[in-house]
Amino acid sequence: MKPQMHLAIDVSWTQVETIWREPGARVNRHYPDVGLFEDIARVAERGLLDLIFFGDSTGIPNTWKNSIDDAVRYGVAWPRLDMSPWITAMSRVTKHVGFGLTYATTFMHPFYVARLLNSLDHITNGRIAFNVITSQRKADAQNYGFDELMEHGQRYDRMDEFMDVCQALWRSVEPDAFEWDRATGRVANPDKVRAINHVGRFFKVKGPLSVPPSPQVVPVLIQAGGSPRGTRTAARFVDHVFGARKPIPAMSKQRAEIDAALLAEGRDPSKVGVIWSTQVMVGETEAEAKRMRERLIDGVPREAVGAWLSHNTGFDMSTLPPRFTLRELNERIVAANASPVGFVAQLAQALGDDGEITLDEFMEHGLRTATSYATTVAGTAAQIADDLEERFEGSGSRGGFMLRHSQCEQIDMLHNIVDLLVPELQRRGRFRTAYSGRTLRENLAT
């Protein structure tokens, strides 16, 4: 039997992709619409997908030109909902598909997040995943009482401690602690409910968690840090790593780096998958899919690209000179206590650190990256399945793909994934024909 891949869909509304302007899209004056999210969940489950994923940020992007104006004008990373209550609605119309929530350990408190995710795991009968992130976004920091972001390494130190606290809390009540003995009146055995008494650099938490253990006990844990420090931190606790689509040798190299970090932590690499983020446009014909891709690219305003890239790096791209090298750009980003994003590294790989680029050229590269269209696979179901299968094998056949969100804002396009791509992968023996697990963790077992 061939190794099978997992499939997730990313429904992290950003609007910068402009697909909301296409005929049939349901993001409109009535947004948000709970019916849209329920329909997405129904279609995803009909396609036997593993996970519906929600990225998050809590501040309106304000790094570009030191203003929120272009982000508001063009819908860049806003509006964004707290998806936790919406997941309850989606879970009521499904039984198997999982839900991934994102919280930044840079600002949140572990007791709150541990309790919330435990409660949602109960509501969904064991279908919750936690995407653990740091934040490099000043707009987020400013909504949590910080004028500036903490230093990069410190953000990961805080994440390490945050996850230590969460995992201790999730295990602070034993699965058999509850008795519900009518004769004695005993609800639970106090010997099986223990304080964690955590005192650390960032948090002081007595515990225990004030809720019963959930079906998964610990939600499925996901992390996307691509830096060496991010990889080391992820290796301590993750079940799956999010990776960005790149050339197959680079995917294989990243998989090897993750495996080495897992081994250094005494963990079995075969138990941890990589979910590669991949934008696909499935059409009845290749020409139809490619026309859609080009039409969407043409609809994105330059100011929206600048706002998105500045938000994601924490560096104001509007301050760049007309010409610069990638080395100079990286120096500016680091000096601003910001974080280079993947496409800067990709450009450096293509041009060299000292290769000069004009601002217009940079923004054109940024356009295709901010919208994910630089790496979009546009074609028929068979063509996309060829690509996914090649990448799956080339990166170790452990994990799968997260199909990016522009497909999902338009239900008809999500139908193309479920009705065209999924059957093609099933014919090749690369995707399940039925859910086999009771919980998300069981369905995601690699």
Give, region by region, the residue ranges found by the protein language model.
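Hydrophobic, small-residue-rich alpha-helical packing segments that form membrane-like cores
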Residues: 8, 12, 26-35, 87-98, ...
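Short, acidic/polar
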Residues: 31-44, 223-233, 380-394
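Conserved, mostly hydrophobic/aromatic
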Residues: 7, 44, 48, 90, ...
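Hydrophobic faces of well-ordered beta-strands that scaffold small-molecule active sites
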Residues: 5-9, 52-54, 97-103, 126-132, ...
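N-terminal beta1-alpha1-beta2 module of alpha/beta enzyme domains
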Residues: 1-93, 216-219, 332
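Acidic (Asp/Glu)-rich catalytic clusters
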Residues: 1-2, 45-46, 88-95, 121-127, ...
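An alpha-helical appendage that flanks or caps ligand/catalytic pockets
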Residues: 1-15, 153-216, 249-256, 260-392, ...
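A conserved active-site cap/scaffold subdomain adjacent to cofactor or substrate pockets
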Residues: 230-247
